[in-house]
Amino acid sequence: KANSADLRTKGYELSLSWRDQFTLAGHPFGYHARATLSDFRSHITKFDNPTRTFGKSYYEGMRIGDIWGFVVDGLFATDEEAKQYTSEVLDCSYINGRMTGGFLAGDLKFVDLDGDGVLGIGSNTVDKPGDRKILGNSLPSMQYGFTLGFDWLGFDVSAFFQGTGSHYWYPHGFNMNFWGCYSYSYVSFLQRDFIQRCWSEENPDAYFPRPRSYSATGGELSKVNSMYLQNVRYLRFKNLTVGYTLPKRWLDKVNVDKVRIYFTGENLYYWSPLKKNCLYVDPESAFSRSSDVNNHMSYTWQKTMMFGIDITF
């Protein structure tokens, strides 16, 4: 290992908080709020890669986290459309070299961006990337959180939300939670709505293509593309705590200073565009494509609910 690259990172962090109280129905009502926001971008400013080949990890001007991939213009509606496509794009072997019978109805329709009649990676450099382009970035465009709470008449409530702005993730071929039988023919996990989500002549507007085993581990789905690149931004209801402290006069006769009954919930709900395409991958556990081990079958954040009582003597 060597320190062979120069990196420039620019970003910001913001934090705002407010706490106050006023009288409500003759009793003090206290409330508080806190919000945080941060963002950063990192670029390579110096690296020994004069041709800017993708064969090396970095190149000058590279933004860390950029995702290069192919553009997909939907699925072929008929075998005839697929045949017409292959008469215009003559060499599709980089994409469909392992597909028996070539492109058929229900397969992905890749766009020949450079118009040379060949679907591929060109010279595999930034200047000649073939039919690839930057589709997104794997690092969050921003990270934020906010807390809201109040206390009144012995009740106290606090809620914490946490989330990120847009960032993107392409599922690894071994991620059966996302791909199901597109990973392996002997897959042990099949989504309950799989039949409704995959292409067939009766379901031409499906999100997933015609079923082909191993297409995510070596076929057309293994090529990073715009159709299955996932925006994994999210907003998570991270914590809710509701408590009630018994009035002191109730406790005087039993020699107890304080009794508080409470409920705490963790990871109660989340909002994310990923839910539209897959209910079985948690956006917070969707790592970058290079983290193969974490990409395969990551556990989701568990929802927990707990009731308790605090007694102070």
Residue ranges and their predicted role:
Residues 13-16, 301-313:
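Outer-membrane beta-barrel "beta-signal"
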Residues 2-8, 12, 21-136, 178, ...:
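Conserved small-residue
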Residues 16, 33-35, 159, 261-263, ...:
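Membrane-embedded beta-strand positions of outer-membrane beta-barrel proteins
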Residues 23-25, 154-158, 249-250:
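Repeated loop/turn-to-beta-strand initiation elements of outer-membrane beta-barrel proteins
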Residues 27-33, 142, 153-155, 233, ...:
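Outer-envelope beta-barrel architecture signal
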Residues 20, 37-43, 152-154, 163-167, ...:
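Transmembrane beta-strands of outer-membrane beta-barrel pores
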Residues 6-12, 37-43, 139-144, 163-165, ...:
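Transmembrane beta-barrel architecture of outer-membrane proteins
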Residues 165-260, 265:
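Extracytoplasmic gating/loop element in the C-terminal half of outer-membrane beta-barrel translocons
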